Swiss-Prot record:
Residues 117-231, 628-697, 1087-1148 are annotated as: Disordered. Residues 396-779 form the USP domain. It comes from the Eukaryota. GO terms for cellular component: cytosol; nucleus. Interacts with ttk. One of its GO terms (molecular function) is cysteine-type deubiquitinase activity. This is Ubiquitin carboxyl-terminal hydrolase 47. It is found in: Nucleus. It comes from Drosophila melanogaster. The modification Phosphoserine is found at S172, S173, S238, S1131, S1132, S1140, S1141, S1199, S1201, S1205. The keyword Cell division does not apply. Its EC number is 3.4.19.12.
């Protein structure tokens, strides 16, 4: 870390929001932090989505609106003073009136300390104010407060409280109060003998107030203890200006006894903490040395005020705020500090739940033995006296390894089951194979969940004990399946232990499977056990669901009648008789698990589906009626079950597996609801009322309370699990969603019932988030337990607990602060990242090398060389790795001096988080040696005559100063392989030092000054991005409904460069091995030197005039991987520019890339020439330069249209790419104007797409460009929609064009319509549009045009001319319509009550399909008659069959048609099956049933089978690729995991600057 970056200060943020619970926080600000980063830091500590942030400077200066300066460095904001404590004001969004002269009254809190009393009324002399303190060079500065206190009476300390509290016993005289204000600390500077004190006026935050209040005591021994409380961020003391006035403070002396007592108390503080002592001349051994410098990742590692975010040094304790952690720290309300009675405010229930009421004070030392953990625990009464309202942060989440949400949900439910957790704690580990022992790893995980200071803990140790490798984390599984498999594994491991019957005692119930003869009433039973009860959501074959789990349970025990051909052979009657077959519950388990079977199979569509129907469940469930069966219970059950179909909730549809419910064939059930369903909204408000009657009627032990709801969100093909769980200690409900734990309400629980949202497609748009598994606990005062507290842990757990924490601390210290998720399959891996600059893509790529054996740098190089495809640039012999700090974009050193291939010392010095940079060299060059302690420079190459620029290139130099020097010049010349005397060099001061070089064979001071001026004004804030652009030819733009832009005449005589010139190199001149040819930048500088340089006075008024160090403002991000490497030339010299002769310059001049926007003679951007003056300040000059990239890197690009057809995806596929160098302070409006000129598409008709569908809105004309440096943007063509506009995909249907090779209807274009567009208007617009696209649509007219509404992949409705086009506002999927060109004699507008079908004739004699035809059936039409009219088949010889597949149903094999049993030949009308289950647009086959099928020989069958297979592959590879069913792996837990061989592998390379 450089000196510049190590500068930091503290700011206080005062929340002025009415009703705010957190009035003030403190934030650490580094010198390289942008305003936006500071706003983001503050936003993590408040629940507001948006807020106004103002800076209230000192000396009554005007307020500064920081929201308008987001890209500016915080240190450079006018009024921000790093030497002082700055104050930020947080206001609700839109509430500031813009009055900059207003001053906010800020509550400056001071620490209250009760006065230390002396006996005999004597006063000790105070030390002289301003006493000189000497500091030995090399020692750390010791922060020493200059405060003291005195009292007329003698001070004593209570020995009983000395280990638990830092207190000063005092006895004060009545009616006497004294206040003494002192400074909090003395700060001595290196090289100075005096450490001036800060006055309270200069640093009010550093003031300490010592109060003595009126108290009385019964005896000198029974004294009231006073708490010493300090401000939360004592570490963040601001340095004091030397010019600050020094005031003498009248401090009362502290007697020797008091100082000795204070010394004893302060020794209890943990090491590494900075403290403020009230003693002015306390001995030096009372003070702790300075904490280490803060890192950029510390906020994410523990700066939150949450109790789960403590570091390893604080066991169970809440932070006191003097932590050496960067970031935000909450400040306690003054009402909770230093109460008169010496007690603490009440502690919340959930915090007691986590820590069991056994808290250690925040300043108490961490215990290292099991006895210490228990003996140091306080009582429950003391715990309740702690600070309240810590919120659900007291619960710890579980890290999702990849797709292990199902595992996390079940583990949290088991952890929150007191009986299971306590029993697991009672189990004792008795062998040495820890890694493979499932109960032991589960026990450790539960201890972590109960005691860890983290926000979330890992599950990798547990999954390794399952025998899972890394691929298992990427498999989706069912939570109910996992529950059964895990319980089986635990039972196996618990054998021959005291917990052998744990699973059966808690979760096992019993039922009788019976058959009862209805003639002799003989009943045969077989007892079965169950761990969960699977409840169908719908009765078999029904489209209506059970309304509640009680109904489903009654249906579960409803007997089946065996009659007819299925009669029961009664042994007593000696004959077949009618019988009842069913289930009786014999006993229910203590923990009852109900599994709602929401996943089913639709035999019509032949797809898996998810049933999202509404099924209610109570919080109190009485099951005694299912055990206490009366004689007529069967009749009662029968009667109840008979009403299921009538009284259940309406069909809410099913979630199709294909494309998350949007792509399959959906059968819409009846939309009618039972009248009782009109009260669905009121259903379940009193969730216990549904069993209130049964609770009264059925008495017994089986009364249950709900405590866990496992929820699935998604479709049958995949989704996400999370859990709602109740804490039995406080009866509060929480949502456990992987790492996040939040409070929920009863409304959240009711929403988990499921049910429809009430849209046109009830089956396709039903809410897919609903309860999947429920857990109830039996209400039994004798058996119900509470979770074990720390003090109640068994002895072996008390021994394990400190070991667990020690392992965690060791892991943290070994891996350092940049901790990565451990790979499942490779437990002891070192996984370095290797970076490489790809010159073809002009961007940095990254791969991660997995080393499971002893580390060897040569193996890492070989693996990275292969994965990063470096072989196309240089052989392995000309490659090397250098040590690299990816978080800071800096080279650490080269490795020539390291003789150890394991790099043991270097890796240890970097906390084993060392990354590498892969470099290669030219054949005639040698690698440069990089000594340690150098500086990495960003070097840009610029041609001042054309303003062409490239870079940045990483150049490592031993030059420590951040100015141009001979050392830096030599490093640049060596690295870029150019003459040291033939280039100009200019530098700018920045967080990352930048240098700009320009070729000049005869450099002059004037030319150098010109370059330096340009660097200071135009170049200092340059960053870079990549832009992927699709095809923008006329045909493509017409299909997408996008117009073109007329070429703008060049202003100021600038050239307009056409698309061919955007490549930067003339055809045939491009060479990937010399992509950065220095000749491209050699220009005669005489002409630009004769032109006037930019006016610096004018520039000072531009947007970035107040920013002297803004070059990194755009790239700040909390994810360090995004900053790794920059877009830098990291290979050594292989593609470095070569020096060339002057004769080459003229030839290379034509290859020079010009910026597509226009530059005037001095190179500054003339914004007014192409940008609306309303969008930009008139004086704004921002740099913009684009150069075409040789290769298009489409990795990591996304689309906001998540459901694209193959044709559309091909249209939008990037065909060319550019590298953009842009000034960071450019407005989005100007940025898009440049892109508009670059791609010749109006700004209103394209979007800039980021990865993960994160669009940059077109409405950001007044916002700065906030992008991640080096990230790739993708141009997505399409009109920016107005509020009432919608985008639709248009497909074309002409029956004559469809054959067996047609897999689906082609998407011919996109079209924008509004909410008032009718089908008739749509016909006119679409016919005209299709005529413009292609001549093959010339026969289409408004008269023969029909518009279908497309649902999924089938046509579902014909729109009448006066009908408005439909759009579901809640769906992010674009609406789709089909334009059909109807054949002659076909009515484009059939009746509303008719049924239009597409039919094909099947010829069994030829084994061939006929052409597509269309028929329309009226209400009284008979399908055979209609088919006979379009064919020569008599009506009595016709057979027909419905095809259940996606339109046009060409994926059926000709060999299987004759074998189908679904042919019908009976008369059928619309009210009879199968037409009553048919929708408009379905496809039927028909045939002459009297024609026999052709008999094939073996050879003919073989040939036809091969031909059909090839055809289906051609059809299926297009139509089923996205919908191909994933091959599922069975969930297994291996009780004996095999060892895996060690090797070295590398991950696939990816873009460094993309959010992953």
């Amino acid at each position: 870390m450089t000196d510049k970056e190590s500068e930091q200060c503290t700011v206080s943020v005062f929340d002025q929001t009415p009703g705010s619970e957190q009035k003030k926080i403190n934030v650490v600000v580094r010198s390289h932090f942008t305003v936006k980063r500071v706003i983001d830091l503050i936003g993590t500590q408040f629940s507001y989505e948006k807020f106004e942030l103002l800076l209230q400077p000192h000396d009554n200066k005007d307020l500064v609106n920081l929201n308008a300066l987001e890209s500016q460095l915080m240190y450079e904001v006018a009024g921000f003073e790093p030497q002082l404590k700055n104050h930020l004001i947080l206001l609700p969004s839109g509430s500031w009136d813009g009055d900059v002269t207003k001053r906010f009254e800020l509550p400056i809190k001071r620490v209250v300390v009760k006065k230390v009393m002396k006996s005999d009324g004597e006063k000790a002399k105070s030390p002289a104010t301003g006493e000189k303190k000497k500091r030995v060079v090399g020692e750390k500065t010791k922060k020493k407060p200059a405060s003291g206190s005195s009292s007329p009476s003698k001070a004593k300390t209570t020995s009983e409280d000395s280990l638990a509290k830092t207190s000063i016993s005092s006895e004060s005289s009545p009616e006497k109060t004294s206040k003494i204000k002192t400074t909090a600390a003395k700060i001595s500077k290196p090289g100075s003998e005096k450490a001036p004190r800060a006055s309270p006026e200069e640093c009010p935050e550093l003031s300490t107030e010592i109060n003595s209040k009126n108290t009385s005591s019964e005896s000198p021994v029974a004294k009231k203890t006073a708490k010493v409380t300090s401000k939360p961020t004592l570490e963040l003391l601001s340095p004091i200006k030397p010019s600050s006035p020094i005031k003498e403070l009248d401090c009362e002396p502290v007697d020797t006894l008091s100082k000795q007592q204070l010394s004893e108390q302060l020794q209890l503080y943990p090491q590494g903490r900075n403290l403020i002592s009230p003693v002015d001349d306390a001995p030096s051994d009372l003070f702790i040395s300075d904490a280490e410098q803060l890192s950029d990742d510390d906020l994410a590692l523990g700066a939150s005020a949450s109790p789960t975010m403590l570091g390893p040094g604080y066991d169970y304790g809440a932070p006191t705020g003097d932590s050496d952690v960067e970031g935000v720290t909450g400040v306690t309300d003054p009402s909770t500090i230093g109460t008169d009675d010496g007690t603490y405010p009440a502690l919340s229930n959930f915090y007691r739940r986590k820590y069991g009421g056994d808290e250690l004070r925040a300043w108490q030392r961490v215990n290292t033995t099991g006895a210490d953990f228990v003996s140091s625990a306080t009582t429950e009464t003391e715990a309740e006296a702690r600070q309240a309202s810590l919120g659900p942060r007291g619960y710890v989440g579980l890290v999702n390894q990849a797709m292990t949400c199902y595992l996390n949900s079940l583990l949290q439910a088991l952890f929150m089951t007191p009986e299971f957790r306590n029993a697991l704690y009672r189990w004792e580990f008795d062998n040495d194979n820890e890694a493979k022992n499932i109960p032991y790893q589960l026990q450790k995980l539960f201890l972590n969940l109960q005691t860890s200071p983290k926000a979330a803990v890992e599950t990798t140790d547990l999954t390794r004990s399952f025998g899972w490798d890394s691929t298992e984390a990427w498999q989706q599984h069912d939570i109910q399946e996992l529950c059964r498999v895990m319980f089986d594994a635990l039972e196996h491991k618990f054998k021959n232990t005291k917990q052998a019957n744990l699973i059966s005692n808690l979760y096992e119930g019993k039922m009788n499977d019976y058959v009862k003869c209805l003639e002799c009433n003989t009943e045969k039973t077989r007892e079965d056990t169950f761990l969960d009860i699977p409840l169908p959501v719908r009765p078999f074959g029904s489209s209506s669901a059970y309304g509640s789990i009680e109904e489903a349970l009654r249906a579960f025990v409803q007997p089946e009648t065996l009659d007819g051909n299925n009669q029961y052979l009664c042994e007593k009657c000696k004959k077949k008789c009618d019988a009842h077959k069913g289930l009786h519950f014999k006993s229910f388990p203590y923990i009852l698990t109900l599994h709602l079977k929401r996943f089913d199979f639709d035999y019509q569509t032949m797809h898996r589906i998810k049933l999202n129907d509404r099924v209610t469940f109570p919080q109190t469930l009485n099951l005694n009626t299912f055990i206490n069966r009366s004689g007529n219970s069967g009749e009662q059950n029968s009667q109840l079950n008979g009403t299921v179909d009538d009284c259940s909730t309406a069909d809410s549809g099913s979630a199709m597996e294909d494309d998350n419910l949007s792509s399959g064939v959906v059968t819409t059930a009846s939309s009618s609801q039972h009248e009782n369903d009109l009260n669905d909204e009121d259903e379940g408000i009193d969730m216990s009322s549904s069993t209130s009657k049964s609770a009264k009627q059925g008495s017994g032990p089986y009364l249950y309370e709900l405590f866990a709801i496992m929820i699935h969100s998604g479709s049958a093909s995949g989704g996400h699990y999370y859990a709602y769980i109740k804490d039995f200690d406080n009866n509060e409900w929480f949502c456990f969603n992987d790492q996040n734990v939040t409070s929920i309400t009863q409304e959240d629980i009711q929403r988990s019932f499921g049910g429809p949202n009430g849209s046109y497609y009830s089956s396709a748009y039903t809410s897919s988030t609903n309860a999947y598994m429920l857990m109830y606990r039996q209400v039994d005062a004798k058996r119900n337990e509470l979770v074990a507290k720390v003090a109640d842990f068994p002895e072996h757990i008390k021994t394990l607990l400190p070991k667990l924490h020690s392992e965690e601390e060791t892991r943290v210290s070994r891996l350092g602060r940049h901790i990565t998720v451990t790979d499942l399959a490779l437990p002891d891996l070192y996984k370095p990242r290797v970076y490489f600059y790809n010159p073809s893509l002009k961007k940095m790529k990254i791969t991660r090398v997995y080393v499971s054996q002893s580390f060897n740098i040569n193996l890492v190089l070989m693996s990275a060389y292969e994965m990063l495809n470096v072989e196309q640039f240089a052989p392995l012999s000309r490659c090397r790795l250098v040590a690299y700090n990816s978080s800071m974009d800096t080279i650490i050193q080269s490795l020539e001096s390291c003789t150890d291939p394991a790099l043991t010392e270097l890796r240890a010095a970097q906390n084993y988080s060392l990354d590498f940079l892969l470099e290669y060299r030219a054949e005639d060059q040698e690698f440069e040696v990089y000594p340690p302690n150098g500086i990495t420079w960003y070097v840009f190459k610029v041609d001042l005559s054309t303003m062409a620029m490239d870079g940045p290139f990483l150049v490592y130099s031993a030059a420590r100063e951040r100015e141009a020097s001979d050392v830096l010049r030599r490093s640049i010349a060596l690295r870029l392989h150019i003459s040291e005397q033939q280039f100009l060099l200019a530098t700018v001061r920045a967080t990352v030092p930048k240098a700009f070089v320009s070729y000049d064979p005869h450099p002059t001071p004037e030319a150098l000054q010109h370059l330096q001026n340009m660097a200071n004004t135009q170049f200092k804030s340059i960053t870079y991005f990549y832009l992927n652009v699709p095809n923008t030819d006329a045909a493509t733009l017409e299909m997408l409904g996008v117009p073109t832009v007329e070429s703008v005449e060049c202003a100021s005589g600038g050239d307009v460069v056409d698309a061919a010139m955007m490549n930067g190199v003339a055809p045939g001149h491009m060479s990937s091995s010399n992509d950065y040819d220095w000749r491209r930048y050699k220009r005669d500088l005489v002409e630009p030197m004769s032109q006037p340089s930019p006016s610096h006075g004018h520039e000072s008024n531009s947007e970035d005039s107040s920013l002297s160090d803004g070059d990194r403002t755009l790239v700040e991000t909390d994810n360090m991987a995004h900053r790794g490497g920059g877009d830098s030339q990291v290979s050594s010299t292989s593609h470095s520019p070569q020096l060339s002769s002057p004769e080459d310059e003229a030839a290379s001049h034509d290859a020079m890339m010009r910026v597509h926007a226009y530059c005037n003679g001095n190179g500054s951007y003339a914004a007014a020439d192409v940008v609306d003056p309303l969008l930009l300040p008139t004086s704004t000059n921002h740099f913009f330069y684009a150069t075409k990239v040789e290769c298009v890197d489409v990795v990591g690009t996304g689309s906001s249209s998540g459901h694209q057809s193959d044709e559309e995806a091909q249209l939008r596929k990037p065909t060319r790419a550019y590298k953009l160098l842009v000034g960071t302070h450019m407005r989005m409006g100007a940025f898009k104007k440049h892109i508009e000129q670059l791609i010749q598409v109006p700004a209103a008709h394209f979007k800039l797409q980021r990865k993960h569908d994160n669009n940059l809105s077109n409405n950001q004309n007044n916002s700065l460009v906030h992008l991640i440096e080096g990230e790739t943007l993708t141009v997505e063509l399409g009109k920016t929609l107005e509020p009432d506009e919608f985008k639709a995909k248009i497909h074309f249907l002409r029956l004559a064009d469809i054959d067996n090779e047609t897999s689906k209807l082609p998407c011919v274009c996109e079209w924008v319509y509004n909410a008032n567009t009718t089908a008739e208007q749509a016909k006119k617009e679409l016919v005209a549009k299709l005529h413009r696209i292609d001549a093959k649509y010339a026969t289409l007219s408004v008269q023969n045009c029909r518009i279908w509404l497309k649902g999924g992949r089938i046509p579902i409705k014909i729109l009448s001319d006066d009908e408005t086009l439909y759009c579901d506002m809640r769906s992010s999927i674009a609406a789709e319509f089909i334009v059909q060109e109807c054949e002659e004699e076909v009515d484009p507008q059939p009746k509303d009550d008719s049924l239009t079908l597409f039919v094909r004739r099947w010829c069994p004699a030829k084994l061939e399909f006929g052409k597509f035809q269309e028929i329309t059936l009226d209400q009284d039409s008979e399908i055979r008659l209609s088919l006979s009219q379009i064919s020569d088949i008599p009506i009595d010889k016709l057979s027909y069959m419905k095809l259940n597949s996606n339109f046009p149903c060409t994926s059926i094999s000709a060999l299987s048609v004759n074998e189908s049993s679904s042919w019908y030949s009976v008369p059928t009308t619309l009210d009879k099956y199968p037409l009553n289950s048919t929708q408009t647009g379905n496809i039927y086959l028909y045939k002459d049933r009297t024609v026999p099928a052709r008999e094939l020989t073996l050879e003919e069958r073989r040939l036809m089978n091969a031909r059909e297979k090839a055809r289906l592959d051609r059809v299926g590879c297009v139509s089923t690729t996205r919908y191909a069913q994933r091959r599922e792996r069975a969930l297994k837990i291996y009780l004996d995991s095999p060892e895996k061989s060690s090797n070295v592998t590398a991950s696939a390379p990816m873009d460094v600057h993309v959010n992953n």
